[in-house]
């Protein structure tokens, strides 16, 4: 069975929707690959290989599970919406406002 890109995106959102309820942040699907993203704080960014819309994060930490989520990273800057592939963290968008708990 082969799903179209839009059907796959709708399926991903329907499966992830209940888990996103009540989060103080919002991360859309990745702009380059339509993966689910979560907030990461990174010390820096370099252009991702073969992409015009994404960046590879440098020394990143996942802050999605922080009890008191804040929009400021420990070393300054703001969290970015990213996904991980192996040891790499790929970021494509800014973190948006979610639903407060």
UniProtKB/Swiss-Prot annotation:
Keywords for this protein: Conidiation, Disulfide bond, Secreted, Signal, Sporulation
Domain of life: Eukaryota
Stated induction or repression of this protein's expression: Expressed after 12 to 24 hours post induction of asexual development, which correlates with the development of metulae and phialides. Expressed in vegetative hyphae.
Protein localization: Secreted; Spore wall
Disulphide bonds in the chain: 27-81, 41-73, 42-60, 82-91
Residues annotated as signal peptide: 1-21
Subunit (UniProt): Self-assembles to form functional amyloid fibrils called rodlets. Self-assembly into fibrillar rodlets occurs spontaneously at hydrophobic:hydrophilic interfaces and the rodlets further associate laterally to form amphipathic monolayers.
Biological role: Aerial growth, conidiation, and dispersal of filamentous fungi in the environment rely upon a capability of their secreting small amphipathic proteins called hydrophobins (HPBs) with low sequence identity. Class I can self-assemble into an outermost layer of rodlet bundles on aerial cell surfaces, conferring cellular hydrophobicity that supports fungal growth, development and dispersal; whereas Class II form highly ordered films at water-air interfaces through intermolecular interactions but contribute nothing to the rodlet structure.
Protein name (Swiss-Prot/TrEMBL): Unclassified hydrophobin dewD
Source organism of the structure: Emericella nidulans (strain FGSC A4 / ATCC 38163 / CBS 112.46 / NRRL 194 / M139)
Gene: dewD
């Amino acid at each position: 069975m082969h799903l179209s890109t839009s059907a796959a995106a709708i399926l991903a959102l329907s499966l992830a929707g209940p888990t996103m309820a009540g989060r103080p942040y919002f991360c859309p699907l990745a702009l380059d690959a339509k993966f689910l993203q979560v907030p990461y704080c990174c010390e820096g960014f370099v252009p991702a290989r073969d992409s015009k819309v994404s960046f590879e994060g440098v020394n990143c930490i996942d802050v999605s599970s922080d009890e008191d989520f804040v929009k400021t990273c420990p070393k300054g800057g703001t969290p970015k919406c990213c996904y991980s592939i192996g040891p790499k963290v790929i970021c494509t968008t800014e973190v948006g406002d979610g639903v407060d708990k």
